[in-house]
Amino acid sequence: MEKLLQWSIANSQGDKEAMARAGQPDPKLLQQLFGGGGPDDPTLMKESMAVIMNPEVDLETKLVAFDNFEMLIENLDNANNIENLKLWEPLLDVLVQTKDEELRAAALSIIGTAVQNNLDSQNNFMKYDNGLRSLIEIASDKTKPLDVRTKAFYALSNLIRNHKDISEKFFKLNGLDCIAPVLSDNTAKPKLKMRAIALLTAYLSSVKIDENIISVLRKDGVIESTIECLSDESNLNIIDRVLSFLSHLISSGIKFNEQELHKLNEGYKHIEPLKDRLNEDDYLAVKYVL
């Protein structure tokens, strides 16, 4: 260690003669000194998953392993390594088979983080049968805890965002059906409603909005329940997201029907006192059609 210290001082001073006298440091010692002696990220990912899948490990330890795994896959390369290390399958096993909702929520959070703005991971996830269907079913299940459903919506939003093919599969699996019940539920927490609107926005930003899609949104009650949020909500974030969604429809050339316009008028009476605290462009864009 003393030799390493002498070399380091000489190196920082640019003293080539002193560096020559000290000689080259031991690479292993350098690695230890600068924290490079531990396992690499892929190894840590595999070790974390082994802990998660071990039936003898207690819940708290598994949740810590999930936290460690998620921190690792915030790195894009590590997220893509989930496929290379064959870790999607055990992760999906936890998602579907676990009886512990905390573990299910942790698995959903990892899925959402891994596929966020990551085309490779989006495609990798879709290689596994029923992965998308499972996310939709969990998001739709009113018996699931708030944290689980919220993270299911988070995972779905990130999975379909900016991906036309996955968005179309989401549509064919009736994924839009999980949105309206949340928005029309007066007991639903604001966080869940915001995630539902985020999913709706992610879908619409990934496909061409046409009359067929609008027809389905009307049939499923999505447009009506979204508009009704303007009358029922005092949460500014939710109101802003609703206005953004409606403005998106308007900019796509969609015309509201008579019933929708009536509900919009009622909603605007409710939010008018809040207008100075809302997104001005969206507020005016929607008001213009009234």
Curated annotation (Swiss-Prot):
- Role, per record: Involved in protein translation, propagation of [PSI+] prions, and polyamine tolerance. Functions as a nucleotide exchange factor (NEF), which accelerates the release of ADP, for the cytosolic Hsp70 chaperone SSA1 and the ribosome-associated Hsp70 chaperone SSB1. Required for fully efficient Hsp70-mediated folding of proteins.
Q: Which family does it belong to?
A: Belongs to the FES1 family.
Ranked from the top, the taxonomy reads: Eukaryota, Fungi, Dikarya, Ascomycota, Saccharomycotina
Q: What is its main location?
A: cytoplasm
The answer to whether the entry has keyword Oxidoreductase is no
Which residues are recorded with the post-translational modification Phosphoserine?
S12
Can you supply one Gene Ontology CC term for this chain's record?
endoplasmic reticulum
Q: What is this protein called?
A: Hsp70 nucleotide exchange factor FES1
Binding partners and assembly: Interacts with the Hsp70 chaperones SSA1 and SSB1.
InterPro entries per UniProt = ARM-like, ARM-type_fold, Hsp70_NEF-Inhibitors, Nucleotide_exch_fac_Fes1
Does this UniProt record's set of keywords contain Repeat?
yes
Recite the UniProt keywords alphabetically.
Answer: Cytoplasm, Phosphoprotein, Repeat, Translation regulation
Alphabetically, which GO biological process terms does the record hold?
A: cytoplasm protein quality control by the ubiquitin-proteasome system; regulation of translation
> From the UniProt record, which GO molecular function terms apply?
adenyl-nucleotide exchange factor activity
Q: Which cellular compartments is it found in?
A: Cytoplasm
> Which Gene3D superfamilies has this protein been placed in?
Leucine-rich Repeat Variant
Repeat (ARM) positions are 13-57, 76-116, 120-161, 164-205, 211-251, 253-290
Comment field (misc): Present with 13100 molecules/cell in log phase SD medium.
